[in-house]
């Protein structure tokens, strides 16, 4: 996964560029 905004609201962009939230509460690591 490509981290977009690390550790901020657990938000990151997936490999398709879709903004998603990490349910694990990590820094974009899914």
Curated annotation (Swiss-Prot):
Highest taxon listed in the record's lineage: Eukaryota
GO molecular function: potassium channel regulator activity; toxin activity
Disulphide bridges, residue numbers: 7-27
Organism: Bunodosoma cangicum
Family: Belongs to the sea anemone BBH family.
Keyword Disulfide bond appears in the UniProt entry: yes
Compartments where found: Secreted; Nematocyst
GO terms under cellular component: extracellular region; nematocyst
Keywords, comma-separated and alphabetical: Disulfide bond, Ion channel impairing toxin, Nematocyst, Potassium channel impairing toxin, Secreted, Toxin, Voltage-gated potassium channel impairing toxin
Name used for this protein in its record: U-actitoxin-Bcg2a
Main function: Possible voltage-gated potassium channel (Kv) blocker.
């Amino acid at each position: 996964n490509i981290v977009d905004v690390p550790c901020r609201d657990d938000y990151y962009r997936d490999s398709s560029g879709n903004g998603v939230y990490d349910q694990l509460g990590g820094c974009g690591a899914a």
